[in-house]
Amino acid sequence: VSLRDTLAYLLDDWLQSSQLCQRDRHAEHSRETFEAVLDICDRLAREKYAPYNRLVDQQEPRFDGERVILPQATHEAHQAYVATGMLAAAQTQEWGGMQLPFTIESAANVLLGCASVSISAHMLTVANANLLLAHGSPKQQEVFARHEFSGRWAGTMCLSEPQAGSSLSDISTRAEPDGQDFEADPLGPRYRLHGHKMWISNGDHELTDNIVHLVLAKIPGPDGSLTPGVRGISLFIVPKHCVDAEGHITGRNDVALAGLNHKCGWRGTVNTL
């Protein structure tokens, strides 16, 4: 039994996903449109992902001191994935989406992940943009999330630090107000971050024009010290390239790549320090 057949059984016979079409958000869909999406991703997985899974594992990302270099196959797979519109598949039409049920979007991404986890790591961008839709300001959503859903920009989550690992309460990255007018920026209060992040998947590459890092950091108290534990932690939007209020790139930000980590598995995924 193929993975495609297994997904069909799970979606149709067990979950009865076509019943979701009775909801207003998914009213334009049917079992046929669900199958069409799965067929597209199945073909993409077989043609652009699976044949190059071993290649990207052998030709690991490398840093030449200025940029991260990836195999051409990774670039082509990413471009093909963006062309399907799957980055915004579950979003409303307002965000360029298909208004697919999340269940169908997830099933389609399973096909790609099984073909090559390394190449399909760009799905992290969707999670980044979804967080901005849930917690970002309207301007932040328009400037950052929209570009991520279109595939022009990518996204990451930056939690781990060299001295803390993934122990959230032990992070020490600081975020200090940037000038007297730091609250006047139309994209939100502006801070300068000082610290180191480690093991960041897709932390740097040339697949997209920009990378939107969501960085966990602490704002110092009045005495300049950091609050122990998880209290005082905030989340900051830190783009690789600075942008203006209209989303135009204005120059390089102070995000510095120190190097790449060697991975035991999924070696085709960029993992940064």
Placement of each model-derived feature along the sequence:
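Internal maturation/activation junctions in enzymes
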Residues: 61, 124-125, 136-183
